[in-house]
Amino acid sequence: MSDKNIYKGVNTICTHVGQVKDEQFGGSVSPIYPGTSYEYIDKEIDRYPRYSSTPNQEFLAKKISALEETEDAIILGSGMAAISTSLLAFLNSGDHIVLQNDIYGGSRNLVEAQFKRYGIPV
């Protein structure tokens, strides 16, 4: 059973889910790792920021997943990364997108300039 299933309250989930023991200094909360380069001890795990697999991304994904009661979560570097990932995951050639007039300019540009190539008109 995953630890996200044993904690119920929002505050408890935010505090405990995904927590790792600070072996080096014995801290009471999970450490934050400011680095972007990691030693590859376990060759089965690719640690690289663009794979959303750094320790910070993994801890945060577990917390978000528990809060949203989902199987998993992905942590991205920007809102545009989230928007483009979401749209590209669900849209196929021949689908249509309807946008509101005052949508964020970066989103409008992505959809109008790039999605046309994939046969997804606005």
Residue ranges and their predicted role:
Residues S2-I32:
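Short conserved active-site loop signatures built around small residues
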Residues Q24-G27, S65-L67, A89-F90:
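Solvent-exposed alpha-helices and their adjacent loops that cap or buttress functional pockets
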Residues P31-I32, D72-I74, D95-H96, P121:
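Structural motif
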Residues Y33, S37-S84, G106-A113:
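Conserved N-terminal alpha-helix of the aminotransferase class I/II PLP-enzyme fold
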Residues S52-N56, L99, I103, V122:
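Catalytic cores of large soluble enzymes that bind and process phosphate-bearing ligands
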Residues L67-T70, L91-H96, K116-Y118:
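Short, surface-exposed connector motifs at secondary-structure boundaries
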Residues A89-S107:
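Conserved PLP-anchoring active-site segment centered on the Schiff-base-forming lysine
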Residues E112-V122:
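PLP-dependent aminotransferase-class I/II
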